[in-house]
Regions:
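Conserved small/polar residues in nucleotide/adenosyl-binding loops
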Residues: 192-197
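A short alpha-helix-loop-beta-strand transition element characteristic
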Residues: 67-69, 116-126, 145-153
Length: 197
């Protein structure tokens, strides 16, 4: 049996092929561009992630028996905002973890909702890297894109969806979105019940 590990990083996707004894059979890295459309902004095209991941998988398995692949594991950059429309198409470039445009939205979350309340529910306070401030930024600055949102995903979850057809995330990444009630392990209505900025 063989297993694939996919790490969707900020500058490249790293892929590893391992056998059932934990021996590394192959390692591949594929780079993709990072865009800075304005000072302090950081974006990527999710299609670039997908294309380089697929190329990486082909390269990773070129000398392996593909029928022996028993599982795939996903990891990668956290907190980036990938928004999809009703047809699961990407609406705009992903806003990454290292993007600093959401200072006002973070101030709103920390001051109006409150750091204590945020911390109680999400085990975090709001920072510019997290997902919820990015959603609020899109709502305020790109209302036409906000109106089209049907699904919100994180970068590695988008790649997992493209490879499996399943929309999902994990508790660790969900907690950094500021949308997840960590204590009760469910999505929080905290932002939905608070006044909008």
């Amino acid at each position: 049996m063989l297993y694939i590990g996919i790490d969707l990083g900020t500058s490249a996707v790293k892929l590893l092929l391992m056998d059932s004894q934990g021996n590394i059979c192959n390692i591949v890295s594929r780079e993709y561009p990072l865009y800075f459309p304005h000072p302090g902004w950081s974006e990527q095209n999710p299609q670039d992630w997908y294309e380089q991941t697929m190329e990486g998988i082909r390269e990773l398995l070129k000398d392996a028996d593909k029928n022996q692949v028993a599982g795939i594991s996903f990891g990668g950059q956290m907190h980036g905002l990938v928004i999809l429309d009703e047809k699961d198409q990407v609406i705009r470039p992903a806003i990454l973890w290292n993007d600093g445009r959401t200072t006002e939205e973070c101030d709103y979350l920390n001051n109006v909702i409150g750091k204590d309340k945020l911390s109680e529910y999400t085990a975090n306070i709001s920072f510019t890297g997290f997902t919820a401030p990015k959603i609020l930024w899109v709502k305020k600055n790109e209302p036409e894109n906000f109106a089209r949102i049907k699904k919100i995903m994180l970068p590695k979850d988008y790649i997992a969806y493209r490879l499996t057809g399943v929309h999902c995330t994990d508790v660790s990444d969900a907690s950094g979105m500021l949308l997840f009630d960590v204590k009760n392990r469910c999505w929080s209505c905290l932002l939905y019940t608070s006044p909008s900025p």
